[in-house]
């Protein structure tokens, strides 16, 4: 398990505006707990993104490099 920005397809983060959205998303993907599985966290000049706590290794995370949307 690891703490990380959860990623969509093509190495893209889930942008957010509130902790509740991220906590639900992270928890549904197996993060630490229903009460605090994740939160909306600063992601640099690109805005805020969902940060997950103790996310399982089989769930994609943001890695170095650009988001490559099709």
Swiss-Prot record:
It comes from the Eukaryota. Its main location: secreted. The keyword Metal-binding does not apply. It comes from Buthus occitanus mardochei. It holds the Pfam family Toxin_3. This is Toxin Boma6d. GO terms for biological process: defense response. The lineage of its organism: Eukaryota, Metazoa, Ecdysozoa, Arthropoda, Chelicerata. Keywords: Disulfide bond, Ion channel impairing toxin, Neurotoxin, Secreted, Toxin, Voltage-gated sodium channel impairing toxin. Gene3D superfamilies: Knottin, scorpion toxin-like.
């Amino acid at each position: 398990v690891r703490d990380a920005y959860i990623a969509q397809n093509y190495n893209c983060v889930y942008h957010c505006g509130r902790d509740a959205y991220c906590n639900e998303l992270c928890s549904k993907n197996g993060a630490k707990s229903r009460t605090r599985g994740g939160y909306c966290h600063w992601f640099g000049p690109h805005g805020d993104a969902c940060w997950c706590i103790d996310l399982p290794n089989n769930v994609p995370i943001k890695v170095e490099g650009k988001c490559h949307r099709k």
